[in-house]
Amino acid sequence: MSGIRHIHGLGEFPRIFHRLMCESESIYLNANEHSRADVVVESREARFVADVVRRYPLHNYQRLARLLHRLRVVKAAAEIELVKRACAITQAGFERVAKFVKPGVHEYEVEAELAHEFIRNRGDFAYVPIIASGKNACALHYIANDQQCRAGDLLLLDIAASYANYNSDLTRTIPVSGKFSKRQRQVYDAVLRILRAQIKGLIPGKRWDQWQKEAEQSVEHELLGLELLTPRDIKRQDPEKPALKKYFMHGVGHPLGLDVHDVGLLKEPFAPGWVMTVEPGIYLPEEGFAVRLENDVLITENGTVDLMADIPVEADEIEELMSR
């Protein structure tokens, strides 16, 4: 099934490795590099690299990470199918908790419902879930999940499953009482418009920084419409600290795969086979809520494929789902 024709026991590794080293000149070694990782202890890979260089000091050693990152960011068909399966498990979990949530439920109860649904589908949490009601949603990585959901609040769910080591990444924001207030709906629809625009903007040849700038322009436009910013605010802002950053302070998306924040060469243009998250948000601590929405998107030569297109995201869809 794997295509691997010869399998050796671990006990044979030293002998085979020594023979290969004696016949080789250039050696590529991995150092488990990740832009989001700050490794403070010596890893197993680091110990292996140090031992190899000590034993074979005259070889030409090269860095493997950049090659691996380029390979990992472009997904093969089999990898895409695994991400799709993770997305399907995530959908089952989200639809379950959307029907479960009501005033008085605790955030940890929502987490428990998700754990049951993910595990019964042979999945697991892709990351520690963020189940943030009310003002908790204004903390980007709130994971206490210990508060009671109150009537009238919004509940931000940054929840997703992994399957066979491949991850999905979903965010939805739902009304605890089952209906959005007028103000909540205004902000929700604004974020949804940004999500739609940024999904369309994921095209081969575009770079991440350009895509991020487009997202910030969309956010700025929506903030003006919500009367959270004024034209005067825009005119007087420091270009290094744009006014919109008060309400949207993070990246609009990242590569997805074996890691939730997968390795990728974000200084290089998007290409077919990349899977990206798209996750705009507007955060309003003064009003006691935040809205973030997130889907996973495959970039192809002919446009984008929303891998979460079947997961309810329109406000009316959310309300209908919660009423069942």
Language-model features, listed with the residues they occupy:
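Active-site neighborhoods and metal-handling regions in enzymes and metal-associated proteins
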Residues: 1-324
